[in-house]
Swiss-Prot record:
The heterotrimer binds 1 Mg(2+)-Mn(2+) pair while the heterotetramer binds 2 pairs. Both metals are shared by the toxin-antitoxin pair. Its cofactor is Mg(2+); Mn(2+). Induction: Induced by hypoxia. This is Antitoxin VapB15. Mn(2+) binds at residue 67. One of its GO terms (biological process) is response to hypoxia. Antitoxin component of a type II toxin-antitoxin (TA) system. Upon expression in M.smegmatis neutralizes the effect of cognate toxin VapC15. Partially inhibits the RNase activity of VapC15. It comes from Mycobacterium tuberculosis (strain ATCC 25618 / H37Rv). Mg(2+) binds at residue 67.
Length: 80
């Protein structure tokens, strides 16, 4: 879907958001967090290895459970 061409880019980014993404998805670098976020935003499906890497990341809810979360539940989850 995409060319796979990689370039170096300097960006100003919220360190707290990056750290939260790294914790949530157990990512080992800022680059991994930004890469995952862009792929999810653009909609490119995760490859098999990428999907397996997320296994056990702590996100284990059904769609029904997610839809039933209140704002308070979401805030508590963000704080953990």
């Amino acid at each position: 879907m995409y060319s796979g061409v990689v370039s170096r880019t300097n960006i100003e980014i919220d360190d707290e958001l990056v750290a939260a993404a790294q914790r949530m998805y157990r990512l080992d670098s800022k680059r991994s967090a930004v890469d995952l976020a862009l792929r999810r935003l653009v909609g490119e499906p995760l490859g098999r290895d990428e999907a397996l890497a997320l296994q056990g990341s702590g996100f284990d809810f059904s769609n029904d459970e997610i839809e039933s979360f209140s704002d308070t539940d979401r805030k508590l989850a963000d704080e953990s």
